[in-house]
């Protein structure tokens, strides 16, 4: 089976370099018309460049179709204008990859709240702005594919990245809820947690390992997650050719005869026992497990 994007219109944010560029190039190579969005900022969000135009030129040189957009994902009106321009030019918007992001890493004790809010605003609020801009069109089409970019930091935590972790965890939760809301409209929403050497992460990898973590090795998983046959609600880790699935699990837990702090302490090992754990598909399903325990199941 060959995955094709002929006839599809895709928007990729943060596509002036790194992962976004890799996604945009591969989508265009496989037939999609691509909006390459990038503010052209440095990894902390400062400055501007013509990074988006450079990627559009690469796509055009390879025979593809693309347009550049330099709007900030933090500007809801600019993102709506971008989506409207794509729809006017190409007849719709079928794919959105929310990839734009910044880093302002510090331990929480040393972090200014302005830096906490700035990272949340780009990653989480920016993704919400872009998704809101295309959601109505996707509903009308009866078709949409949206990919959120989370991180191992958002799923598992990482020292010195409280702002980034909060944003990335929020994106995973947003994607799960939108997967439920979009299902009846043919909209599928997934999350990718990439491991790649980009301008945002290159300092984390030893120089001799950078080649193993090329952004191009994350792109296959990302493109599958926005393809016709994509699942919905999945959280997929990808990097260096390794693809994994992440799940939020729930233990069977314990019904306490007397719910007191002391009882929780005494039973904590049993509460935390992962034998027989489950993966609820919705928040409501998690609540039902409590009811089932009350009923003795």
Roles of regions detected by a PLM:
Residues 191, 209-296:
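C-terminal helical subdomain
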Residues 49, 53, 70-81, 113:
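The beta1-alpha1 cofactor-binding region of Rossmann-like NAD(H)/NADP(H)-dependent oxidoreductases
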Residues 3-36:
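Canonical Rossmann dinucleotide-binding motif of NAD(H)/NADP(H)-dependent dehydrogenases/reductases
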């Amino acid at each position: 089976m060959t995955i094709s994007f002929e006839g599809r219109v895709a928007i990729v944010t943060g596509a002036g370099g790194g992962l976004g560029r890799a996604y945009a190039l591969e989508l265009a190579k496989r037939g999609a018309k691509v909006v390459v969005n990038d503010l052209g900022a440095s990894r902390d969000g400062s400055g501007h460049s013509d990074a988006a135009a450079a990627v559009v030129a690469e796509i055009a040189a390879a025979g593809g179709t693309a347009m550049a957009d330099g709007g900030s994902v933090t500007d809801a009106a600019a993102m709506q204008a971008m989506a409207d321009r794509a729809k006017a030019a190409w007849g719709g918007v079928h794919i959105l990859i929310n990839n734009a992001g910044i880093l302002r890493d510090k331990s929480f004790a040393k972090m200014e709240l302005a830096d906490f809010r700035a990272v949340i605003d780009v990653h989480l609020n920016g993704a919400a702005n872009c998704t809101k801009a295309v959601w109505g069109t996707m509903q009308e089409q009866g078709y949409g594919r949206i990919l959120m970019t989370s991180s191992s930091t958002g799923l598992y935590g990482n020292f010195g990245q409280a702002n980034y972790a909060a944003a990335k965890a929020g994106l995973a939760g947003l994607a799960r809820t939108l997967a439920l809301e979009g299902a009846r409209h043919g909209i599928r929403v997934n999350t990718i947690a990439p491991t790649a050497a980009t301008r945002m992460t290159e300092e984390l990898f030893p120089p001799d390992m950078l080649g193993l973590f090329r952004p191009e090795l994350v792109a296959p998983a990302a493109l599958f997650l926005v393809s016709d046959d994509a699942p919905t609600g999945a959280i997929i880790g990808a990097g260096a050719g390794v693809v994994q699935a992440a799940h939020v699990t729930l233990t069977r837990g314990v019904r306490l005869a007397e719910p007191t702090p002391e009882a929780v302490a005494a039973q904590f090992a049993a509460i935390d026992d992962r034998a027989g754990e489950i993966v609820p598909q919705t928040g409501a399903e998690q609540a039902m497990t409590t009811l089932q325990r009350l009923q003795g199941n």
